[in-house]
């Protein structure tokens, strides 16, 4: 399975962001799946989310559907602000090669942090949380999907793995405070926990932005090896995933099958 991570520069011009995302996906060539970063068409700023938001089947989503159909690929459209009534969600839409929307993930764990001497951000001041674990089916098997801060919650990723997820995709805009300490180790740890590939796709770093993303989009294999990491600048990274590794690692080190459900149990509500 060949994937492309689109680590793109995000500007204040929504229409230009959409055009740029389409151009970068086209530049990836012959791929099976592309993934865009968190808030790919909107500055990562509470002051922007509602103004840049759109309802289901809005203009950014229509463009992504058309792009998936044009390229004949699966497309994880990073995330964007989704409007529903008075609520705003941080939402990732997934499109099949025929342009059909086959999955929607609304960020479950909102990014509310206040690090002494570092980053402060309160998504909950504007955004509402999602309530559903998200997986989707492809010819290569089941894929899991979460957004940024969701990736810190092992329980959520375990539920995806128990559904059969072979890859966990996370569009993610980590920042200059948390990412140097946690970005690489977090994606490696989720790969260890769930014995699957983990794919983190960031916006490119823009030092002039109000919120500065880390960049360094990453892919880890089921043995927790980093097999791809981008620089901080804009990049299109194409990686071939050997999904037979998932079965091999789970067979050799049977963590999922060795769980003691007579002692403890993780349930999905």
Which residues make up each language-model segment?
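Active-site catalytic loop in hydrolytic enzyme cores
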Residues: 83-163, 176-185, 252-255
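Short, acidic/polar
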Residues: 16-25, 152-158
């Amino acid at each position: 399975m060949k994937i492309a991570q689109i680590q793109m520069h995000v500007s204040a011009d929504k229409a230009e962001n959409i055009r740029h995302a389409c151009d970068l996906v086209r530049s990836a060539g012959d791929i099976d799946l592309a993934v865009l970063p968190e808030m790919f068409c909107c500055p990562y700023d509470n002051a922007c989310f509602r103004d840049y938001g759109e309802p289901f089947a809005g203009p950014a989503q229509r463009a992504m559907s058309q792009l998936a159909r044009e390229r004949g690929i699966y497309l994880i459209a990073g995330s964007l602000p989704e409007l529903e009534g008075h609520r705003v969600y941080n939402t990732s839409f997934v499109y099949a090669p025929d342009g059909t929307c086959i999955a929607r993930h609304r960020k479950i764990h909102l990014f509310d942090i206040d690090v002494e001497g570092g980053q402060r951000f309160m998504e909950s001041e504007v955004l509402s949380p999602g309530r559903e674990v998200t997986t989707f089916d492809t010819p290569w098997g089941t894929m899991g999907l979460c957004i940024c801060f969701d990736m810190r919650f092992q329980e959520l990723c375990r539920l995806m793995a128990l559904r059969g997820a072979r890859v966990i995709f996370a569009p993610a805009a980590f920042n200059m405070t948390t990412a140097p300490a946690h970005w690489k180790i977090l994606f490696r740890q989720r790969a260890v926990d769930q014995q699957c590939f983990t794919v983190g796709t960031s916006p490119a770093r823009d030092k002039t932005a109000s919120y500065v993303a880390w960049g360094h989009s990453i892919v880890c294999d089921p043995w927790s090896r980093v097999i791809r990491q981008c620089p901080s600048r804009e990049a299109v990274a194409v990686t071939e995933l050997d999904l037979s590794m998932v079965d091999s690692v789970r067979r050799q080190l049977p963590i999922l099958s060795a769980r003691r459900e007579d002692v403890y149990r993780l349930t999905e509500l």
